[in-house]
């Protein structure tokens, strides 16, 4: 069934446009409440934990969700600004029936979204998303409203951030501290602006803060994981040992070495995988990544006796593959890194701490750790579009794709996909000659831009 509300990572759109309107959002809360009541809830009176990032529209979305859940007899516990992985943690820690994070992740402030976690701390299944969509769009939910004393209540939880800070710090071995390390930390003016500095400072690091002054409008604005230049420049300027750049909801991280060189999710995966294998802590000597990861990752991991399993894009797909086969490390080039022994979803702070652990254990600088991976030249073009058609139905698409594959002569690849969260077509081309693959990628992007606008 084609998704009508949910994309690759929850519901996401410009605030006050479908489906992120107060009416639809309230119905999402009602639908979730109805499903929680239908299945035996954990609590006699069901409860849901709700957090958010720092967008202006977060207040509106929070009120609409709360209204919908309360009207179905579900108690709501509001925890305020907190990273996405923090809600996964709190759903379990607080024995809630579900958790919701209000965020559009790396998108600009005018967008917002909803991600839902089950009582186990993992994002809900595609099947449950389908059920919510059917209830919201095709069902009269008012027939199921709670009455009288069965209505839900709402209260604010003041110590949620502190609980999550302790949980993150538990991902870092007790035998190490971060004393002696100067860390540039960019919080993207987002959900981690209080939590992340506390974590790194309490572990002993000297922290140089960027992106820690949210005003409702500046989340991800030339800051954070999508704009690592601020971090890299600060690393060089302040002679820092490492840079850590989170996105708006802190479920992804991009790092920088002491020279200001960007360390992306592929590098982070490779460094963590080899370290865990050396320690005998990498089940089945396998990691999970997506089709967007650089092919150099596969070759490097093979040289170290590690298998790479690839999935469709989205950390939810990565996590599902990990859980299905018992793997504990996975992630995406974009910086969603999942350490399943500790977190239920991508956690930027946890991923960064794992790399800092390797630095401490090995006594090496991050540039030394990352130097063993030589990426194949890769070009990614994001093309704005107005509609999404089946790719093979676009006139000229199949012929051009075949031509590009022929031009690459088996030494590269082309991958074309739609974003699941934005109106974008993504064109990725890899090959030995950067100028050549850039021309090929632009040729495909131009075709899509012309055909889909």
Give the ranges of each region predicted by the language model:
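An N-terminal, well-structured beta->alpha segment
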Residues: 1-67, 71-72, 153-183, 393
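Gly/Ser/Thr-enriched, mixed-charge loops and adjacent short helices
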Residues: 14, 112-238
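N-terminal small/polar loop signature for handling phosphorylated ligands or for N-terminal nucleophile
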Residues: 34-42, 47-111, 198-256
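Short glycine-centered, acidic/aromatic-flanked micro-motifs in structured strand/loop junctions
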Residues: 51-53, 185-187, 257, 341, ...
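Active-site nucleophile and cofactor-binding loops and adjacent substrate-binding regions
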Residues: 76-85, 262-265, 289-290, 311-312
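Phosphate-binding and adjacent anionic-ligand microenvironments
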Residues: 242, 279-453
């Amino acid at each position: 069934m084609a998704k009508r509300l949910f994309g690759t990572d929850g519901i996401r759109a410009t605030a006050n446009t479908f489906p992120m309107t107060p009416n639809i959002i309230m119905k999402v809360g009602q639908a979730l409440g109805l499903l929680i009541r239908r299945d035996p809830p954990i609590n006699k009176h069901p409860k849901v934990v709700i957090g958010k990032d720092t967008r202006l529209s977060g207040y509106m979305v929070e009120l609409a969700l709360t209204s919908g859940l309360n009207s179905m007899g579900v108690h709501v516990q509001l925890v305020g600004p907190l990273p996405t992985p923090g809600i996964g943690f709190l759903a379990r820690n607080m024995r809630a029936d579900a958790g919701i994070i209000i965020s559009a992740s790396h998108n600009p402030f005018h967008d917002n979204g909803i991600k839902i976690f089950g009582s186990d701390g993992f994002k809900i299944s595609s099947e449950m998303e389908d059920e919510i969509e059917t209830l919201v769009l095709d069902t009269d939910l008012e027939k199921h409203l709670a009455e009288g004393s069965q209505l839900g209540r709402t209260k604010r939880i003041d110590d949620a951030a502190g609980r999550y800070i302790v949980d993150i710090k538990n991902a870092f071995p007790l035998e190490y501290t971060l004393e002696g390390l100067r860390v540039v930390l960019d919080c993207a003016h987002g959900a981690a602006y209080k939590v992340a500095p506390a974590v790194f400072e309490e572990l002993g690091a000297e922290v140089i803060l960027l992106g820690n002054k949210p005003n409702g409008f500046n989340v991800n604005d030339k800051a954070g994981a999508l704009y690592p230049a601020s971090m890299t420049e600060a690393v060089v300027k302040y002679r820092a040992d490492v840079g850590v750049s989170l996105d708006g909801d802190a479920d992804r991280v991009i790092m920088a070495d002491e020279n200001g060189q960007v360390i992306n999710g592929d590098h982070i995966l490779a460094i963590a995988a080899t370290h865990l294998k050396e320690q005998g802590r990498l089940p089945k000597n396998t990691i999970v990544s997506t089709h967007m990861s650089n092919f150099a990752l596969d070759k490097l991991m093979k040289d170290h006796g590690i298998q790479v399993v690839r999935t469709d894009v989205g950390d939810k797909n990565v996590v599902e593959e990990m859980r299905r086969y018992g793997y504990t490390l996975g992630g995406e080039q974009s910086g969603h890194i999942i350490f399943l022994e500790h977190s239920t979803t991508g956690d930027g702070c946890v991923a960064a701490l794992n790399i800092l652990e390797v630095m401490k254990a090995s006594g090496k600088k991050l540039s030394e750790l990352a130097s063993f991976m030589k990426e194949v030249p890769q070009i990614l073009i994001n093309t704005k579009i107005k509609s999404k058609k089946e790719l093979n139905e676009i006139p000229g698409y199949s012929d051009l794709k075949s031509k590009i594959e022929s031009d690459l002569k088996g030494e590269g690849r082309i991958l074309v996909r739609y974003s699941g969260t934005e109106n974008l077509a993504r064109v990725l081309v890899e090959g030995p000659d950067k100028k050549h693959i850039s021309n090929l990628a632009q040729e495909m992007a131009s075709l899509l831009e012309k055909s889909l606008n």
